Amino acid sequence: MSCTIEKALADAKALVERLRDHDDAAESLIEQTTALNKRVEAMKQYQEEIQELNEVARHRPRSTLVMGIQQENRQIRELQQENKELRTSLEEHQSALELIMSKYREQMFRLLMASKKDDPGIIMKLKEQHSKIDMVHRNKSEGFFLDASRHILEAPQHGLERRHLEANQNELQAHVDQITEMAAVMRKAIEIDEQQGCKEQERIFQLEQENKGLREILQITRESFLNLRKDDASESTSLSALVTNSDLSLRKS
């Protein structure tokens, strides 16, 4: 049972990370779609202004205006096609999110059902509750199991079935507590990962700044060395010229 819980915890953590990536991608696609819509509206407005200018400035060649309008129309069609592709990609991401959450709920349901395989009545009730939460947010998964247990215990039962459900109440509550604890551990792990990521980003930024400073120092040192070499070369040239002139003077003397 502990191995199953650990495996479910690892899978749930992976699913949460994948959901976060899909959420970020979906938000990015929404922003891009909004920007493209604004660009399309701006293009349409620009085309209308061009038409108005064409009516006002009739002395200008119509061929130039027609070519400009045709070019703008091509750009608008390209933007519309790109907008359509982005919308399709956004729908695919949303479908993937729904599929991932459905798989996650099924896995958590199988975990609870495995511990209740000897009680078909509880399984049927859990199945009914599972079918009612297809559109519930992922952060409400532990609330689903609490609602399921509450619904089972509050349902009208009689005789042996009622007593049997009351006898299994403590065991079901224990599993609900385990699932709630798993959710808390998942949230804690995500927070730790985010904190670690922030620390790594800060460390990378610090190293980049240090690297930039060292590069600047190296550049200054290199320039100073080159200038020093140039000065030495000029001094050597001047000294050679002076020696040559002195030698010539001595020879003439």
Curated annotation (Swiss-Prot):
Stated family: Belongs to the SIKE family.
UniProt main location, coarse: cytoplasm
Gene Ontology molecular-function annotations: identical protein binding
Keyword annotations from UniProtKB, A to Z: Chromosomal rearrangement, Coiled coil, Cytoplasm, Phosphoprotein
Residues modified as Phosphoserine: 141
Gene Ontology CC terms: cytosol
Region entry Disordered, spans: 231-253
GO biological process, one term: wound healing
Role of this protein: May be involved in wound healing pathway.
InterPro entries the record matches: SIKE
Protein name: FGFR1 oncogene partner 2
Site, as annotated: Breakpoint for translocation to form FGFR1OP2-FGFR1: 132-133
Ranges annotated as biased composition (Polar residues): 235-253
Biological source species: Homo sapiens (Human)
Illness association: A chromosomal aberration involving FGFR1OP2 may be a cause of stem cell myeloproliferative disorder (MPD). Insertion ins(12;8)(p11;p11p22) with FGFR1. MPD is characterized by myeloid hyperplasia, eosinophilia and T-cell or B-cell lymphoblastic lymphoma. In general it progresses to acute myeloid leukemia. The fusion protein FGFR1OP2-FGFR1 may exhibit constitutive kinase activity and be responsible for the transforming activity.
